């Protein structure tokens, strides 16, 4: 460990990578034993027959498990929030069969690119059931999304300007949401969106209202990847409520129609 006393800069400790073959039942480098249990069938179909037909390696997805997990989550939220709407993130896995399964269960399509948007449309997802997120939306993609009444969450001032241009061309006002980033504990995910703590998000709200071409109808936030810490989502929800009251008290936006969207 090398330290500069003047600037208090510490050199990061180097840990040599560990590459070993893990075996079911034995501890890994973190002291945890993998809990994978071999089983011969998936949804009643013998795995050996699938391997004979498609070869190996082979990724197999259980439709029954997907549907059961979705219904469990929907039930858990619906008990407390009857108007909850679950959306499936296409970037997680955009295989058409998987996306179609969640669509059949009632999930909206959450997409982050024109490519994923096209997948949703190929599955006959209605525009109003598509949530269009992502930091790089082209004017062509936004124009299509507006025409098909998709739910659009703005990531930057550039998108505000693009959508205002589209609104002028179509002689209409466009409902939008904005993406917030915020301090949510140990996790830092502030690459995209408008910052809550610095008041950048509120400045974006004022800019949207001043333009007169867009209507704020939603708040969106993404907590990061591989994150199952419930406390982080609690923090996000609390800050969403704080921001809602800030908008209600300090701007002329109609807050009664605002929706919250977590990712």
Task: Give, region by region, the residue ranges found by the protein language model.
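Phosphate/pyrophosphate-binding loops at sites that engage ATP/ADP/AMP, CoA/4′-phosphopantetheine
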Residues: 208-213, 245-253
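Short connector loops/turns at beta-strand edges and beta->alpha or beta->beta junctions
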Residues: 47, 137, 181-185, 213, ...
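Single conserved hydrophobic/aromatic residue that forms the stacking wall/gate
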Residues: 253-263
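Active-site-proximal beta-alpha loop/turn segments in soluble metabolic enzymes
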Residues: 99, 146-148, 181-193, 218-233, ...
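Alpha-helix N-cap and loop-to-helix initiation/capping positions
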Residues: 137, 155, 192-200, 228-239
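Short, well-ordered amphipathic alpha-helical segments that serve as non-catalytic structural scaffolds
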Residues: 201-206, 237-247
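A charged N-terminal "starter" segment
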Residues: 1-168, 172-174, 215, 249
